[in-house]
Curated annotation (Swiss-Prot):
Required for the insertion and/or proper folding and/or complex formation of integral membrane proteins into the membrane. Involved in integration of membrane proteins that insert both dependently and independently of the Sec translocase complex, as well as at least some lipoproteins. It comes from Staphylococcus aureus (strain MRSA252). GO terms for molecular function: membrane insertase activity. Keywords: Cell membrane, Chaperone, Lipoprotein, Membrane, Palmitate, Protein transport, Signal, Transmembrane, Transmembrane helix, Transport. HAMAP family: YidC_type2 (MF_01811). This is Membrane protein insertase YidC.
């Protein structure tokens, strides 16, 4: 359910980002602007003007990295919960599927409630929390207003320094640049690919769709926006690629280690009887030989 809601959410956000406009002074008001956009504008202006000697390209890079580092604990918690849930589900899947079949075959409300109660017992047995899994989108929702605040600062060029000192590397921060646009699109493709590698098979199609849709939307918006926006997206995507890659490696090991007792308990429960039977069969065959 969580994965199915991500695509409409992502598309809705992209439409919102493309449609909002704070470029005109009379539109610079309201809760979102005052809470998220204006503070980002002031921080970026202070970084570029006072700390970095009018180097606004470097100011954008530093601000994106600082925001991503601040949000890192939320993202790491999401990675950990996702890996734990996936590893536990591998063990619990046979039991869960049997009970889900009971729910489908239930003819009365009482039978359905009994099957659902049985399902909750399985979740409890393997220390699985479906509600916690459903809240996996929460870290993303927490970070969105902050990231979107910086997005609008760059999209609508609200910092005067971007006009006065626009040159950074090979491009003009105040104008569209095809190369930084391509870099942003490629990095978001890689980021979606890295994320999809750890998805279960039934959810992987969603990851493949994101691999196509997100770069197209990024390129489409960047081609008609200041290259400062492409720089922002490139740095953000590069950070996410590294973050996702190493977090997946680490938390997959952690999850497998923590789930091992459940696997051993499952094997004892389901293979214990057959092992005893096998031993008895061996004893009987030895007696016959004698």
């Amino acid at each position: 359910m969580k994965k199915k809601t991500l695509l409409p959410l992502f598309l809705g956000i992209m439409v919102f980002l493309a449609g909002c406009d704070y470029s005109k002074p009379e539109k610079r008001s309201g809760f979102f602007y005052n809470t998220f956009v204006d503070p980002m504008k002031n921080v970026l202006d202070w970084l570029g003007n006072n700390l970095l000697n009018d180097n606004y390209g470097l100011a954008i890079i530093i601000l994106v990295l600082v925001i991503r580092i601040i949000l890192l604990p939320f993202m790491l918690s999401n990675y950990k919960n996702s890996h734990m849930m996936r590893q536990k589900m591998k063990v619990a899947k046979p039991e869960v599927e049997k009970i889900q079949e009971k729910v489908k075959r239930a003819r009365t409300q009482e039978e359905k409630m009994a099957a659902n109660q049985e399902l909750m017992q399985v979740y409890k047995k393997y220390d699985m929390n479906p509600i916690k899994s459903m809240l996996g989108c929460l870290p993303m929702l927490i970070q969105l207003p902050i990231i979107m605040g910086l997005y609008f600062v760059l999209k609508d060029q609200l910092v005067d320094g971007l006009f006065k000192y626009p040159h950074f590397l090979w491009f003009d921060l105040g104008r569209p640049d095809i190369w930084i646009t391509i870099i942003a699109g490629v990095l978001y493709f890689i980021q979606a690919y890295v994320s999809s590698k750890t998805m279960p098979d039934e959810q992987r199609q969603m990851g493949y769709m994101m691999m196509v849709i997100s770069p197209i939307m990024i390129i489409w918006i960047s081609l008609s926006s200041a290259s400062a926006l492409g720089l922002y997206w490139s740095v953000s995507a590069a950070f996410l690629v590294v973050q996702t890659h190493f977090a997946n490696i680490y938390y997959e090991k952690v999850a497998k280690k923590e789930v091992q007792p459940f696997i051993e308990a499952y094997e004892r429960e389901h293979n214990g009887g057959s092992n005893k039977k096998g031993k008895n069969t061996q004893v009987v065959s030895k007696k016959k030989k004698k």
